[in-house]
UniProtKB/Swiss-Prot annotation:
Origin: domain of life: Eukaryota
Main subcellular localisation: secreted
Free-text description of this protein's post-translational modifications in UniProt: Contains 5 disulfide bonds.
Record-level GO cellular component terms: extracellular region
Source species: Iotyrris olangoensis (Sea snail)
Subcellular location: Secreted
The protein, known as: Turripeptide OL71
Signal peptide stretch: none
Domain notes: The cysteine framework is VIII (C-C-C-C-C-C-C-C-C-C).
Amino acid sequence: ASCAARACALSGSNITVTYCSCTDGTTHVCPDGDSHETNDMYFCENISGVAACPDTNTVAVEVIYRDDSTNPIEGFQLHCRCSTYESSGLHYVCEELIG
């Protein structure tokens, strides 16, 4: 299987690590940290969407929606990655996008 389509992106940084199982967007395949440790969260990144973002500090990622701690994945939503993420209700969002 190719790793070209997706990779795991570490929030709060420009680090992107290859993670082949990100090709399955229906399951929780990226590693993650504690729900309160949002700076350590990993997100499944759509590499093809990176070029649509204005610069290297805003990378397109699919935000992982969480319904609860035992069944964390409710869906994905594409955003441009900013500098930091934080918890907002049932999902993680870029701090700069909270308004």
